[in-house]
UniProtKB/Swiss-Prot annotation:
It is an enzyme of class 5 (isomerase). The keyword Isomerase applies. It comes from Streptococcus pyogenes serotype M5 (strain Manfredo). It comes from the Bacteria. Gene3D superfamilies: Sugar-phosphate isomerase, RpiB/LacA/LacB. Its EC number is 5.3.1.26. Heteromultimeric protein consisting of LacA and LacB. PANTHER family: DNA DAMAGE-REPAIR_TOLERATION PROTEIN DRT102, RIBOSE-5-PHOSPHATE ISOMERASE B. Belongs to the LacAB/RpiB family. This is Galactose-6-phosphate isomerase subunit LacB. Pathway: Carbohydrate metabolism; D-galactose 6-phosphate degradation; D-tagatose 6-phosphate from D-galactose 6-phosphate: step 1/1. Keywords: Isomerase, Lactose metabolism. The gene is lacB. GO terms for molecular function: galactose-6-phosphate isomerase activity; ribose-5-phosphate isomerase activity. It catalyses: aldehydo-D-galactose 6-phosphate = keto-D-tagatose 6-phosphate.
Amino acid sequence: MKIAIGCDHIVTNEKMAVSDFLKSKGYDVIDCGTYDHTRTHYPIFGKKVGEAVVNGQADLGVCICGTGVGINNAVNKVPGIRSALVRDMTTALYAKEELNANVIGFGGKITGELLMCDIIDAFIKAEYKETEENKKLIAKIAHLETHHANQEDPDFFTEFLEKWDRGEYHD
């Protein structure tokens, strides 16, 4: 399995630790940068990770910046990417199993290296649970990537809201 990884200058050390961990587990790592502590901008590296995943160069991606918010927002702008900013195992597993997330994002100054490694390992091993409901939700999310006339429709999510009101979703 190939994992693309990218970060900004604030968390280069953390990225390298995660990269070393992944290599020790036998994964091929595609390092999308940055490679040092020279000031740079996280959108560049979020985009590179996202493109590596959607182009098939990588199976999954990992994005890390100081808080994780910026780089995760950037990678999610790449059409076909479903990235989740996570700080715990439960969120990471939900993202993969229910939403078929293909990138995972972290705040390298928020979440410690060891916890990041544990979460990433579980994320990689988790499998998407394909159900009709999950497929519909993912299709709705994907539909937002391009402009469609019915996207402006105030009833765009009505089907899901009605199911929520009927108690069909459980938190």
